[in-house]
Amino acid sequence: MDNLFTFLHEIEDRYARTIFNFHLISCDEIGDIYGLMKERISSEDMFDNIVYNKDIHHAIKKLVYCDIQLTKHIINQNTYPVFNDSSQVKCCHYFDINSDNSNISSRTVEIFEREKSSLVSYIKTTNKKRKVNYGEIKKTVHGGTNANYFSGKKSDEYLSTTVRSNINQPWIKTISKRMRVDIINHSIVTRGKSSILQTIEIIFTNRTCVKIFKDSTMHIILSKDKDEKGCIHMIDKLFYVYYNLFLLFEDIIQNEYFKEVANVVNHVLTATALDEKLFLIKKMAEHDVYGVSNFKIGMFNLTFIKSLDHTVFPSLLDEDSKIKFFKGKKLNIVALRSLEDCINYVTKSENMIEMMKERSTILNSIDIETESVDRLKELLLK
């Protein structure tokens, strides 16, 4: 981890990170993080009864548990704004909301109606789909006009699905769904699977998302603010997430180790100089501290922050290159999966930029109208 941050610091005058996803590999000695969090979230409907430590309440916006049988969101109401009457309601026509109408539940309903949550994304996506029933096409081919085509409504306790079809092409279906949601206190519950993955999610107020899988491996999607400047800000954001995440684990799992790690993490946060932060991270790696010793890069992107004032020559890019140009002048390096990958493509990017500058200078010095076609091809296509 320290070597990665050292290199990102070396290039931060030219490149800035955009997407940054990473994993914390599960460790047997830590215990069943997924199982214990699942048990706590499943059995409670108040945020305070899940997250006891009030010192970290400001950092956590929502907890989500999703498996085949149940999807449950627990929201931290204090992290949401007070809505006025003109606040847009995003999802009423997709959901039947059942609530006990208490003050706490009513506030949760208000938030749910206005927030673009994963439930809203799921139901909107499934409503948009037009589906071709290939089985019914086969019936048409082999069975003629007597083939049976399904349209109508099918539903269970929590999900109503309406299937419509065109009389001229009855095998093409338009599918609309409406979901029942039960809201009690801080909890938003629906039955059945509403995601591809079975995970627990912790959504932070800074938009970072931590996904915990069944084996307690974690996938962390680190958010980025517009005012993030350089590697030191990135380290602070990552270790801020670590600090609050590990105190949450200590809260739920009752493992003092996480409190100890949170204290070590806090030293990185309070250090003011980048060199000191990197030194502390290196020491954590040497002592096999959780969060550093089991850190693994998932994927990250870099963007070239300087302006490209010369002509861009796309022909210099390999077909499978991770260097991409967007909107003609925006150079990004995408889907980097290791420090070695990063160093390799930054080097290629630097060399390519120099070659483009040279070609651009030559191109600007010649008369395009009188220059030979072969010479122009050599400049533009090779």
From Swiss-Prot:
> Pfam families in the record, alphabetically?
Pox_int_trans
Any coiled-coil regions, as ranges: none
Which InterPro entries did the record assign? Poxvirus_intermed-TF
Induction details:
Expressed in the early phase of the viral replicative cycle.
Keywords from the named record? Activator, Early protein, Phosphoprotein, Transcription, Transcription regulation
Subunit structure and binding partners = Heterodimerizes with protein A8 to form the virus intermediate transcription factor (VITF)-3.
Role summary: Acts with RNA polymerase to initiate transcription from intermediate gene promoters.
Q: Which family does it belong to?
A: Belongs to the orthopoxvirus OPG150 family.
**UniProt-recorded name of the protein:** Intermediate transcription factor 3 large subunit
Lineage per the UniProt record:
Viruses, Varidnaviria, Bamfordvirae, Nucleocytoviricota, Pokkesviricetes
